[in-house]
Amino acid sequence: VRTQSPDYIVIGAGFTGLLYSTLAVLEGRSVFLYEKQNRSGGLVGSIQTPFGLVETAANGILNSYQLEELASALGLKILTTEKKSKKRFIWKNGSPRRFPLSFLDTLRVLYGILGISAEIRAGESVYQWGVRVLGKGAVKNVLEPGLGGIYAGDLKDMSAELALGGWISSKGSLLKNIREIKKIKTKNPKQKKGTVSFRGGLGELLNAMEAKIKSSPNSKIYYSQESPTLSSIRKKYPNSKIILSCGLESSLKLLSSGFPVFKKYEKLCKTLGVVTVTRFGNQPLLGKKSGFGILFPSDSGFRALGVLLNSSIFSGRVSKGHYSETFIFGGALDQEIVKFKEKEIINVLEEDRKKITVQNDEPLNHYVTIWKSALPIYDLALLEFNKELDRSLPEGIFVEGNFRYGIGLSSILERAWNVMRNQKGRT
């Protein structure tokens, strides 16, 4: 019977596992998806509250032709950002600035973009690359808060090849590299640009993927199931392709038991904790100003890495008359906060908030999400692990997730497209 041997065995039903399983089902393949929790979605989730929507992780995904195709196949309508969310701020000298660089820093950036080779040197950290190509001012005021908001990492430990390699492939200037990448990327001329979501948040996309897999007659999702070992899967389903999409730590555990070459990476590759808090209130954080959010450089006096202004980003995110913000804490430079109690985290948030606004807006509610090991540290050890995967994984086994050459949901989606549609998992 066909059900006995699916085309794919997928371990982990977070965003990555659901995505690979859905792409397989859309191609008419069968999938057995194993998930140790009693629900799918992993880190990503959308919770409806009386005050509005809460996103437990990412608040959106960069649009691409791949996302538009996927949404169309699942019958979903993409939601674009509001015009008023166009402005993005970085905190500088006591206020949110759209352009935090001095005149001299700006000249240095222009010189770097046009005149310095952006080629990444062996073992170079993002910090070293940034200082060399863009100058110290840009690193401190733009690159550090910008990448800190995405990777939550310390730029001095972050591998430039791993974090920036997707954008830089030649010896030319940064401008030349970016132009070359833009030429390669397939575009739909009518494509909506920038960050997008769905009416019910990113959870709507995850629910639709889950429903698609469940509706496939030869596919099945097994919840509350500890992952079977690689050897037992290969024994039971010798013809099935295997996709590990269960996060860095669990993937390493499974790989190490099957292939000794990966054992050393269990100790070397680390993850970071992240805390997100969505706060509902009656007043907008920036008064009459609006925008996407504010990033806080490490020396700006804030404990938060940044804050998203949810009410300005997507329509329908709050109930009438309310406003919502999501503060993000933790990462490499603040590993203690994941150990805090919810009440302590809320106090930290309210103290940070007082530094932004003078208005005394009583909070209506806070929704705290603590991820003790959410994000991989994008360091040289992780780069080596990725290269080892490219070299040593046997045919028919794939290891995927936010540690594979790109941390964001859009990077995972683009890579999944290459693996599933073109069987190009190597970079």
Descriptions of predicted regions:
Residues 27, 225-338, 356:
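Mid-domain catalytic core of redox enzymes
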